[in-house]
Amino acid sequence: MPKPRRVFLTILILLVLPLAAQAMTVRGRVTLSDGSPLPGVTVSAGSVTAVTDPDGRYELVLPDGGSVRVTAALQGFQTRAATVDGGGDATQDFTLHVSYGQEITVGSRAIGAEAEKAVPVDIIPEEQIRSSPSTETAQIIQKIAPSFNFPRPTITDGTDTVRPATLRGLGPDQLLVMVNGKRRHASALVNANNSVGRGSSGVDLNAIPASAIQSIEILRDGASAQYGSDAIAGVINLVLKSDAEPLSVSAKAGMTTHGDGQVIDTSVSGGFRLGRGAIFATGEYRDRYETNRAEADPRDQIRAGDAGNNAVAQPNHHWGDSYARDVMLFSNLNLPLTEDGKQVFYAFGGYSNRHGSHGGFFRRALQAQNQPQIYPLGFLPLIEPRVVDTSLTAGARGELATWFYDFSAGYGKNDFDFYVTDSLNTSLGPTLQTNQTRFYAGTLGDKLFTVNLDLSKEYKVGLAGPLNVAGGVEYRREGYAIEAGEPNSYRDGGFPDQFGNRAPAGAQVFPGFRPSNEVDTSRNSKAVYLDLEGDVLAKLRVGLAGRLEDFSDFGNTSNGKITVRYSPLRQLIFRGAASTGFRAPSLNQSYFSAVSTNFLRDPATGQLAPFEVGTYPVSSDIARALGATALRPETSRNLSAGLVFQPLANFEVTADYFNIDIEDRIVFSGNFTGPQVLPLIQPFGVTGARFFTNAIDTETKGYDLVANYQLGAGGWGRLDFSAAYSNNETKIVSEVATPPQLAGLSEVLFDRIERRRVECGQPKDNLRLMQSWNRGGLTATTRESRYGEFCSFTLLPIDDQIYDAAWLADFELAYDWRNYTLSVGAENLFDRFPDRNRLGTPQANFGIFPYPSQSPYGMNGRFVYTRVAYTF
């Protein structure tokens, strides 16, 4: 049977199934322990959900009359669940208690709903995570939060496998990521090539399985005064599932309608009682196959005079998503130590193993990088990383002598092993007797150890409400290491290239790390913080936060924050914040070194050509010869102001303006390969160099709009609508800080490519719309995303290109029947692609690369899928 007919029949069956189901209704009320109503609670049974109204009431319309498990959950409170027997309509009430085993929402150390905060916090609940067409955590966030960007770079070395994520158009390392409120370690990878976030090391969000996540909190405000380094753009906190829940098995399969990009994702998860507590465990396996949108290479492939040297254009490149196979395990334990549940031991952590594979630039048979006796038609070298990520955090929280305490210790580690296949080391000669095609190119390692003690207590001091006092101390130790690859991955074998000239040394596509690159270093920091927050007047809440931190490598830093929340009416809240922040230079930026093949614009031809360029730490002799100095922390000033308007219990609008000034931003320099710098670097035996430096000041400003509306349609079910818009613009507001040794070379230190990467390389505005209809067990969800325009990373104005904004649509139809959930859907329903690269420009590479690799929505086209889940 043809594939389109099978898909059509599957959809038809899912549409007909609800007609045979006998619906039942579950109603009830959710209250606090004192009997007062609790609005905003998510009550769910399978994929059917409702949110309690101002009187705490809810109603669920279920597809059949069988037994069903109903769950009531609200951040900051203990989740409650009950089994409701079938046989007709039923009533189920819940009483929720403040949770001592659950993290407090980011942005404040006082419990409260996100709308009550003085800073904007987005909450992505479990039902939105579960219904997303994506399975990767970072893509799920991008589908919902317009301030979040997750492009799909290609031919960027390891960045193809661990892709950068940004918030508000800033860098990946200016976003703090936490799990259950605890700092997450960064990836060992440095984004060293032509991608968004070049020169940074962010957190690998996709190492955390989405099936383990209860909710995702996004703080859109600077928070260094509360959480320390990196929280300049904001904070993402992943809250793990923690309750006893039935075992669930899920499987998803899909592919693009262009015949590639197959995804197979399976997960098993469940929560199990353990004494008075519970442990939730998740296992997930995902195969994501590559996509390829490269077009034919029109150039000669074989040396002149050889047979068929340009008979037809050759489709021999790879341009698209890389292959990735992920195996992930995660668990979260909460174990009360006392009968009243006020002393809790907790532990959470996980393991992930990713095998990636992606191509570099194709080496034609006639290029000096090839030995035609080994690859007579040329070759596409592959980088095949192995990325292993482990983490474990354990601690205790509860009440002690009227204080709430939280003591924890955590360890996280990321190892990034580089393997190169289908390649060669040109300098090892033209035969496999002296050469080889597979290399181990070395390992990058990053690790983080933290110890925290947090204390908080409410005091009555004569204000309109209690004063929440929170304080704490933190010790953090970071480590970074580079391990050399096998000798043949980097050494110069002395053989000439096919033209008799000196051959480039090292494995093609990624020369291995050399013994001279090896490093094993660490630093530590100690911090103390204090938070005060309370109702100064009946309608005015003020918060103050301060943090002092001492780093072993660059000294002290202090930061503060003030927040104000004013509510003249129950339906209206004005809020604002002012803070200072910082980002400590990462050890990766201070100590990373490597020699790699970079395809840069050749001044003679105007096209991309290979250059062997070395990256050197700022402490090295060659970097100091170019004027490099020790890296300083980035510092920031953040202002925000906004409002929350809730005219109806089921309708809410928020609007927030922000301004972020950053001084001494750390950037990756341009490639010093020209004749002006050769006298400086030739004594060191190299022909190209680059390094990290504090070079620019920037200003980022913009605004965010969010609206949510829920509509009960009586017997027709429930309708949910949401809209979110983000606008941001980043400008460089200073001259490039150029050392005297490079006088007159500021356009090389921070060239036009890097300027465009910072100022227009990411969309300046994004819009997300979502509509969801639920009746009984049937749920239909549509999403529309508008991605704003972005620019090419180009050196010459003649090559500049602006890629137009684009609308993409997703659709999913899901049906709950007894213990099964069946879903079919399409991502990028109308098969939208970004604008094509203009022919004749470096980004088009002779027409081989049709689409920009920095596209925020990739270049895969329509993706269709089906998903089935079973709950025991």
Task: Identify the residue ranges that each predicted region occupies.
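N-terminal periplasmic "start-of-domain" segments of outer-membrane beta-barrel proteins
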Residues: 48, 103-135, 158-159, 188-198, ...
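Short, acidic, small-residue-rich periplasmic hinge/interaction motif at the N-terminus
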Residues: 33, 73-75, 87-131, 138, ...
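Short acidic/polar hinge/loop motifs at secondary-structure boundaries
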Residues: 61, 182-220
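Gram-negative outer-membrane beta-barrel transporters
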Residues: 471, 652, 656-794, 867-871
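C-terminal beta-signal and adjacent terminal beta-strands/loops
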Residues: 729, 784-793, 814-872
